[in-house]
């Protein structure tokens, strides 16, 4: 790992205070010889998770029907610093901020300076200044050929059903996956890097908790 920098972009989960379903039952199968196992009762959208097309349509692909390369690759991190609170991210904003760095098969993480933890009671209140996505945002990303879109705390995918549904429709129909509840993006030192986020290979899963890891400085995955 010489000359490489590794950043964990995952939410660490504590079942005692997690708001989404997360229950663990630990038991000893070995009697006098300790042999502990754990039954996990989890929801598929727990913590940092990758959502697959099956999440949005019963006829689209689940986590096992996508190639493993859908869950790793070259990533471009875009943090919008010049857009007003509660603005929509439009194609011209993406063109300007991406600086020609986004191509077919890339991963894109969208973020802004207007940060708020997602999926809380503060969502869509006066405190929520995050940027919005819409149909036009999705079309630009689709036309670029990206394979994954991730979201930092500065971009909302909860503002209204029309925008959120259109965003899913346009991208997931093309087998684009989504990365949600990303953490520690402020620890990144580069805007282009290698990213991996492998799901559990369980047939029928629409989404899976993932350990998202950025590797900076890997040859072939730089600007």
Model-derived regions, located:
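Active-/binding-site microenvironments in catalytic and ligand-binding cores
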Residues: 1-223
């Amino acid at each position: 790992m010489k000359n490489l920098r590794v950043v964990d972009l995952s939410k660490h989960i504590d079942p005692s205070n997690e708001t989404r379903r997360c229950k663990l039952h630990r038991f000893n199968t070995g009697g006098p010889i300790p042999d502990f196992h754990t039954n996990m009762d989890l929801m598929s959208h727990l913590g940092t998770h990758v959502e697959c097309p099956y999440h949005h349509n019963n006829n689209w692909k689940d986590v096992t029907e996508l190639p493993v390369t859908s869950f790793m690759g070259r990533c471009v991190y875009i943090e919008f610093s010049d857009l007003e609170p509660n603005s929509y991210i439009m194609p011209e904003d993406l063109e300007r901020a991406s600086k020609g760095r986004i191509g077919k098969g890339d991963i894109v993480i969208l973020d802004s300076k207007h940060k708020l933890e997602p999926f809380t009671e503060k969502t869509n209140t006066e405190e929520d200044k995050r940027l919005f996505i819409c149909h036009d945002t999705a079309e630009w990303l689709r036309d670029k050929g990206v394979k994954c879109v991730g979201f930092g705390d500065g971009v909302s995918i909860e503002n209204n059903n029309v925008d959120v549904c259109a965003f899913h429709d346009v991208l997931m129909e093309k087998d684009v996956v989504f990365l949600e509840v990303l953490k520690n993006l402020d620890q990144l030192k580069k805007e282009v890097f290698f990213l991996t986020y492998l799901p559990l290979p369980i047939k029928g899963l629409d989404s899976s908790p993932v350990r998202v890891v950025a590797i900076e400085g890997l040859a072939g995955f730089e600007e």
